[in-house]
Amino acid sequence: QCFTYANHARCNRDLIHQIAQVTAEEANALGYTNIYSPILDIAQDPRWGRVVECYGEDPYLVGELGKQMIMGLQHEGLIATPKHFAVYSIPVGGRDEGTRTDPHVAPREMRTLYLEPFRKAFQDAGALGVMSSYNDYDGVPITGSHYFLTEILRQEYGFKGYVVSDSEAVEYIMTKHKVQPNLEDVAAQVIHAGLNVRTNFSLPENFIVPLRKAIEAGKISEKT
């Protein structure tokens, strides 16, 4: 992450742009077409282990530095994938694993603090990818939320790229959030929500097979 939190203290847009260009050159040399960067989470709880990966606690600063990272990456032909969308950086007690429950953030705070850097990423910098987060909001997992992945992201922000899940975020809809009874219904929920790519290396039984069953059962239409 190139000492992300330290870089925010300098607020050096040119430096971030240069970091992005070097990152893109190295990624291109390896044959990559996209990269899961930048992290646009807002640092709020110092107990959270990923605070060091954030640009800071100010949405303006995070948005401005994030824009430079995105433009630097995409100028070199690499697709930027900002993460983690959305309201991810305030887990209960600062713990990152089994506490991915509703962060209890008011709508106004969500908009002006946690979503603002992402708005800039899509509307100002033209990011072509985004990663959905593990947590839920108001009881609905973000990775299965039509409100976040379609209404806000595509209809409001005008996002035209792909939505990729964080690792196992799809499975967590059943195993952690427990809002669906089986993987077939999970597959239907995430597809209807607006997810395009699932991130995880696992057997077909974990997603491909349930997805086929959901389509055969009419839970996912051809139009979707």
Language-model features, listed with the residues they occupy:
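Glycoside hydrolase catalytic-domain context in secreted enzymes
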Residues: 1-224
